[in-house]
Amino acid sequence: MTNGAASNGASPSVRPSREKERQLLDFEDQLSPVERKQITFVRNTFEPGGWDRAVRLAQRYIGSNWIEQCTKNIRHVHGTERLPKFDRNKSYLVVANHRSFFDLYVVTGYLVNRDMPHRLLFPVRSQFFYDKPLGLFVNGVMSFFAMYPPVFRERSRAALNLASLDETVRLLKRGGMFVGLHPEGQRNKGDDPYELLPAQGGVGRVIQGAGVEVLPVFINGLGNDLPKQVAGNFTRKGTPIIVNFGAPVDFGDLLTQPPSPRLHKKISEHALDEIRRLGAEEREIRASLR
């Protein structure tokens, strides 16, 4: 059976061949002992079995509920009618703008609370989360190990990032995953939330390699001060958080072309254009709340 993504152009039935996928742990000489152990541990939680089942239940019934309680009074969600009906056996990729550390938590927390059964996955910087033992604890407590795989900032370890992208593709292809990525590649610290950073090619590489439906979303209103954010929700005086979902992205013939860094950036730019369009809608929605 052809999946829904193929019918809208998001996932063509014939995909170009790709180079051999890299494995993060193949680069043992570039990883510290702590990084190796923590990557191995978190990776194993994604393997079918008791760990994976336990983490899915924790994300579904604990993580999503505390996010719901901490945001529901000031959160406004639009565009849900554009979303597909989620199939538990398929994987999905959400692409969002990046203003706050908590963007994807709020987006996916909302969906999980409305019966999306998928395992969550958000690539995260390696610094602290994978090179410090405390990072593993925070990853487990804050996200139930959704923060995986690690992304490495050092240019000398660029090959590790390609391996992390390939690991993301591998998990998406397995099915039952919901992955969140930011085409901008880093948090946008500018004053204007509607002025997005340039697209980076890594997201395009994942989109082309995985062949899953890509769901765009624009989110605005979240800060990075967690206590202040939570207090604003309970007093109902915090900045409104607006989440605006779009329909699955149609990439036309981009995904059937031979893979290359230039093509991957085009794919990322196309996804970012959809996010930008949703941002224009969000601006109008926000104005109507005043």
Please annotate each region the language model reported.
Residues T2-Q38, V42-R43, E47, L160-R290:
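Non-catalytic C-terminal accessory region of glycerolipid acyltransferases
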Residues D26-H78, P133-M147:
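A transmembrane-helix-recognition feature enriched in membrane-embedded lipid enzymes
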Residues T45-F46, F86-R157:
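Catalytic core of membrane glycerolipid acyltransferases/transacylases, capturing the structured
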Residues G63-I67, V112, N139, V169, ...:
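Short amphipathic alpha-helical segments and helix-helix/interface helices
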Residues W66-H98:
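Helix-to-loop junction immediately C-terminal to a conserved catalytic motif
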Residues N73, M116-H118, T239-I241:
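Residue-level signal for beta-strand positions within conserved beta-sheet cores that form or flank
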Residues N73, N89, F144-M147, R174-G175, ...:
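Structured helix-beta-strand junction loops
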Residues G79, V106, A163-E167:
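Well-ordered alpha-helical segments embedded in enzymatic catalytic cores
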